[in-house]
Regions:
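N-terminal [4Fe-4S]-dependent radical SAM core
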Residues: 1-72, 79
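Conserved AdoMet/S-adenosylmethionine-binding subsite of the radical SAM
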Residues: 55-173
Length: 173
């Protein structure tokens, strides 16, 4: 976690999940993987296992301890909705966001179909919360446009797009 993020559009990052698997061309030059792999094998480092998927339940309560309101990028070093993260764990992460409602949370995923489906079911309680923003990554037409469709079909109150890395013209949508 960092509560002094160098990412210009957020104040803090919160990573209750670490690591990810590649699912599309937008993952090829992943900054998070490059960063994490530098520390593979360093005992005691948060990324001693590189970019291998790891749940970090000891990080769950972190936003509750931050008393000053922040814009929080959730899982800057992972994707909360990747297939190997259990629904129950995702719900636990979102429950913390519901509780620590003085922050604004930015959730960004390439697994838009799962996010949409969970927002209609197990995360329905959080879909309309104004302090949780639900977003998708868009890198090309093949993957990005369907993610936009999934986001539009979700009940999310606040939606956003991250159009990076933009690998081709995606046209008008």
């Amino acid at each position: 976690m960092s509560d002094n993020s160098k990412i210009e559009w957020t104040d803090a990052t919160w990573n209750p999940v670490r690591g990810c698997s590649k699912i599309s061309p937008g993952c090829v030059n992943c900054y998070a993987e490059t960063f994490a792999e530098r520390f593979r094998g360093v005992p005691g480092h948060p990324y001693e296992y590189g970019f291998d998927l790891r749940l970090v339940p000891e990080k769950l309560a972190e936003p509750i301890r931050w008393r000053t309101p922040k814009m929080v990028f959730v899982n800057s070093m992972s994707d909360l909705f990747q297939e190997d993260v259990a629904d129950e764990y995702i719900v636990s992460v979102v429950r913390v966001m519901q509780l620590a409602n003085w922050h604004t949370y930015q959730i960004l995923t390439k697994r838009s179909e799962r996010m949409r489906d969970m927002l209609k079911t197990k995360l329905k309680f959080a879909a309309s919360l104004p302090h949780i923003w639900w977003g998708v990554s868009v890198e090309n037409k093949k993957h990005g446009l369907q993610r936009i469709d999934h986001l539009q079909a979700s009940p999310a109150r606040i939606r956003f797009l991250s159009i990076e890395p933009l690998l081709e013209d995606i046209g008008r949508f």
